[in-house]
Amino acid sequence: MKRLAQLLLPGALILLPIKGVQAEPPEDPIYVKTSDGWNAAYAHGDEYAGFRVIGNGAKLQDAYHILLQKGVGMMVSFVDKKELQNDGDLLSAHAQWEIDYWHQRASKVESNTREDLTGTRKDVKVTEIKVYNDKGTRISSYLIGLAAKDGVFVLSVSPAQKDVDPLVKELVSSFKLVPRNLDAEETKRLSSEAKAQR
């Protein structure tokens, strides 16, 4: 039986799902409080994605949803490569998978790859998506994809607008794949790093 436990470590709060006493990686993202936001880690198999949410105004809604600042939210997810039906370019396959999803549900979908937000990195892709309903109402988001062995870690930031670009760049610069298990020892290491940043 899973339960969400809050473990208080010296100077840090970690949200960590506990499964009995087994030493399995957590299924949900974990967050470690820092002096200027949160360090996050989301495990899948024997690797995890790490990223930073900068800003003391950032508020965790649950393990998968974060209010980054007033009017700007983020969702954290993982898409298995089996869903993408393309083993070659996982990042492009993921972007197309998202676009196809919205084409089935919206009147109009526009997408644009935002290389200006990723810099020279090839392991990350930012796709800006605008979705319109039949009344012309628009929702927009940035999909930040990080290629992994078994799929794509995704940070979805909404709304997509020019004044959110610097925030997306910060997320991209911190979004890294770590080829280690997110076990108790690694979690302790992350907590110690966060404490040192305080």
Language-model features: locations:
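Alpha-helix N-cap/helix-start motif
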Residues: 1, 87, 164-168
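Charge-rich, low-complexity amphipathic helices
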Residues: 1, 120, 124, 189-197
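Bacterial N-terminal signal peptides that target proteins for export
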Residues: 1-8
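Generic N-terminal leader/processing signal
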Residues: 4, 17-20, 31, 96, ...
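Conserved polar/disulfide-associated segments of primarily extracytoplasmic proteins
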Residues: 60-147
